[in-house]
Amino acid sequence: MTMKFGLYAPIPMAAVGSPEIAAAVTQALQPLPTGAKDAQFELGVDLLMAADEVGFDLALFAERHLGHDMAAWVNASAIASRLKRIRALVAVHPGLWDPVMVAKLAASLDRIVPGRMAINIVNGWFDQEFEMFGGKVLQGEDRYRRTIEFIEIMRGLWREETFSFHGEHYNVTDGQLLLKPATPTPPEIFSVSTSDRGRDFIVETCDWWFVEFPKTAESTDEVMRSLEASIADMNARTARTGRKVHYALNPFLALGSSAEDALDQTVKQIFAYDPDPDTRKIERRMIPATRAGCIGKPADIRRQVQRLEDMGFELLLLKLIPSVENVRAIGAEIIAPLRSGAKAEALAG
């Protein structure tokens, strides 16, 4: 099996069911006691080092400027340097970040962890954050044009000795990035979009597409039909351009004696550590993600992973309860069997 597996670096925005994250939210509001360590960062180190050991391939460092979350670039740089195989996927918001600065940050991180960094372009985001941090909120086609310019400038600076660009949103005159990425192939660009224009943007500009399905989907069969249609549509678009785009998915993965048991255990763990959790996060992000078919018995999950790979997916960026024990269990029950020589036995369960 060639499927790659990823997970989210644990930060308050992206994590549920974690006592360390619950503590980090309170801890972030005040100075640390002398000698104390930040709970959020320590969980990230422990979790991703365990994930590195059991075969995970990628970690997404999401960015939430208005919140208790650590800055993605700082968090990624501090943790990725301790890992051996995991690639750091760092989120960036055009409109809040300057492309020249991001090009330098990316080149720096790529030299610290050669070939193990990529950029997740977030084209649409939380308006309140943009307003608070002085960003410019754009809509529709304007937003895509800005993002395309942003990416073109980064790639130009990585590639050329001297690079100039004069666009609608950015201008660079005789720009020089004297620190180049470590590898000849520049850092890859990931993004997500569901609109027709957004899909064209992915095909024209990005290397990876996070495929989404309707959050209103009520069954795994409905999700699979939606994913199949989306990939068929994108395959037709890439065939017209000749560009290769890789496909990724964000399912929630939870182990249990059945799908119902896995979901029940997950919900209990969430409420055990936070009696008043972010219900929006659960209802809009976690519960729909469980319908991708990756909860339940390990053998059933392994078979679903194989179906997703057969459909064309190359990466599963897993949503999960962020604990070292859970990560190790997923490595032992899902990743290792699928990558072993005994693939037939792994799928048979």
Descriptions of predicted regions:
Residues T2-D38, G95-S164, F210-S226:
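Flexible, glycine-rich active-site loops centered on histidine and acidic residues
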Residues L58-I79, F213-M224, K319-A329:
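Glycine-rich, proline-tolerant flexible connector loops at the mouths of alpha/beta enzymes
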Residues F5-A9, A59-F61, R87-V92, M117-I121, ...:
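Hydrophobic faces of well-ordered beta-strands that scaffold small-molecule active sites
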Residues M1-T34, F126-E129, E168-P186, L263-G293:
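N-terminal small/glycine-rich loop or linker at the start of catalytic domains
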Residues M1-R82, P186-P187:
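N-terminal beta1-alpha1-beta2 module of alpha/beta enzyme domains
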Residues M70-V90, R146-I153, A232-R237, G331-G349:
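Alpha-helix-loop-beta-strand connector modules within alpha/beta enzyme cores
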Residues M49-E53, A76-R85, A106, D110-M117, ...:
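Acidic (Asp/Glu)-rich catalytic clusters
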Residues I11-E42, V92-V100, E141, T183-D196, ...:
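Active-site mouth loops of central-metabolism enzymes
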